[in-house]
Amino acid sequence: MKKIFFLIIFLSFSVIGREQGQTEITTEEGIEVFQKEKYYLLKKNVLIESDEFILSADLVKAFFEKDLYDIQKIESEGNVNFTSSKGYNGVGERLDFSMKNNLMNNFGNNALLNMENLIMKSDNYIMIDDSKGKFKLEGNISELTTDTMNIIGSSINGSYEEINDINEINNLIVKSDKITEITTDTLKMFSSKAVYSKKDNIIELFDNVKVIRNNEIIIGDYARINTLNESYKVSSNESKKVKVLIDSTDE
């Protein structure tokens, strides 16, 4: 009887239309409520609209506290699309979101999270902890795009902060089983591992290092790049030699 009662509430909200402070939920195959465990299941073409977020998915498991509309955590699967009140947009095969902790875990072969000036893509997993300003991307191919850089690697870990409504990267650690790639307007940087510090305005490259600028290619074991003027130094630990290739071909 409770399931029917709650479902009637959902349908009545859909007819009346959502007002500020309300949560509107629509689903084609109804709702299954687990009152003791404080969660409910929504199946097939689920749409949840609230002041904080809009989410659509094939299946949603919603955890609540006081009542069904007091949603604290969501676990969603199948064609997930999520938009927050801050303008963040997430797409994935599975997406878990905690309203209490502002923690999002996005899974899928084409997982995507768009934070306006920060765009994250992965073929496996993206994590955002918005309360602490931390993020993680894990997969065979993970990609982070900012206003000034494009970063590709298997593992991308970092932190960010919001300054004047813009998310700025503070720190980055990029690793890859193959080669990481960092691209700016004037430089292409390759290595097995890369570390970025906004405080020091430095990018460090470790192992299998290659730095390309215009027709110049420098190869070594370690590089240190100043992000303000993009000057750099490349060194070699083992061979004590740095290889420089210059293409002087006239166009």
Could you tell me what each predicted segment is?
Residues 1-251:
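Mature-chain termini and adjacent capping regions
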